[in-house]
């Protein structure tokens, strides 16, 4: 079905009609990655692997169509692509889920009242991080590997406000419909299977300063009863301090379903564009306590990276990370590759 949906989207993009044609966009970020794992579990099975990683490569189609002088229809069909291999293969080696839905929706946008979307979408809680995670581009390094809550949910109805009353503040809220009988409830768990989930965020963004707060409630796919996060970043050049340097931070607490401990995480990051050169360097540290709600299950990640801008569409990447998880493993990752956007 996903392949059929993608073929339909491509056919739509090729049709010449009176309505505005959709914008076709995408990116490929393919890296070679070496991973060395020091196993701390009872099996004590250390591993070393080398692989290609597709790193959220995607293709998308988006557009809008005026319905009235003040309202337009908006849509987006975005699909992740595993450039190096299929996401999964069956017993005969045939590709399964080569294309998978990312943010895919249809909605209405009003000039002054905001935008209403329905489909599959990142939760407002997830989006509240902004650009704080400077290793967000990579599948195996970054915030999503040490914190819960990075959810792209199905059955989402979301509202995004315009800028509020001349102030650079936006509000976003979403309901995640459960798909279950409203009376459904699995015994001996804290998750209310029949209840909808909710997510909201409030963000300030002006002159290089970004501040945001996000909240999740009963988001089943991330197994959270509730979670909140605060995020912020400052472009030091735009406040007349250090040109080219951006500093970011995030703090998050999560009440994990059916666990006695709250997961607590924090992150600090920095990225520096080196003068008139094509180089940028970046660094990030993440610390998580009681990971996944398990007492004293702590984890840290230290990551370093560099980017080399070849032209407007093409960029080279180098990165390395050390991820240590108590009683599980110590993992070293080194990678590099190319990114192309269109």
Q: For the regions a protein language model found, what residue spans apply to each?
A:
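Outer-membrane beta-barrel proteins
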Residues: 1-342
């Amino acid at each position: 079905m996903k392949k059929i949906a993608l073929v339909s989207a491509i056919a739509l993009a090729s049709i010449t009609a009176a309505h505005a044609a959709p914008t076709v966009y995408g990116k490929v970020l393919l890296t070679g990655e070496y991973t060395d794992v020091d196993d701390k579990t009872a099996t004590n099975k250390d591993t070393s692997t080398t692989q290609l990683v597709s790193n959220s490569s995607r293709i998308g189609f988006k557009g809008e169509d005026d319905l009235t002088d003040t309202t337009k229809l908006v849509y987006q069909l975005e699909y992740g692509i595993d450039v190096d291999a299929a996401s999964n293969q069956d017993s005969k080696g045939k590709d399964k889920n080569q294309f998978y839905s990312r943010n895919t929706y249809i909605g209405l946008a009003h000039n002054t009242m905001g935008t209403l979307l329905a489909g599959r979408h990142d939760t407002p809680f997830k989006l509240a991080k902004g650009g704080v995670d400077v290793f967000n581009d990579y599948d195996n390094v970054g915030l999503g590997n040490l914190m819960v809550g990075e959810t792209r949910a199905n059955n989402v109805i979301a509202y995004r406000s315009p800028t509020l009353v001349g102030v650079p503040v936006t509000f976003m809220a979403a309901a995640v419909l459960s798909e279950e009988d409203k009376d459904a409830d699995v015994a001996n768990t804290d998750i209310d299977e029949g209840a909808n989930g909710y997510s909201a965020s409030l963000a300030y963004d002006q002159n290089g300063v970004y501040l945001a707060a996000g909240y999740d409630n009963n988001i089943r796919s991330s197994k959270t009863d509730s979670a909140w996060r605060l995020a912020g970043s400052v472009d030091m050049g735009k406040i007349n301090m250090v040109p080219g340097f951006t500093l970011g931070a995030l703090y998050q607490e999560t009440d994990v379903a059916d666990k006695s401990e709250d997961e607590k995480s924090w992150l600090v990051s920095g990225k520096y564009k080196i003068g008139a050169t094509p180089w940028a360097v970046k660094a990030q540290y993440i610390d998580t306590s009681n990971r996944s709600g398990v007492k004293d299950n702590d984890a840290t990640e230290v990551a370093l990276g560099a980017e080399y801008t070849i032209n407007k569409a093409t960029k080279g990447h180098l990165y390395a990370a050390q991820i240590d998880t108590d009683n599980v493993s110590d993992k070293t990752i080194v990678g590099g590759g190319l990114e192309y956007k269109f």
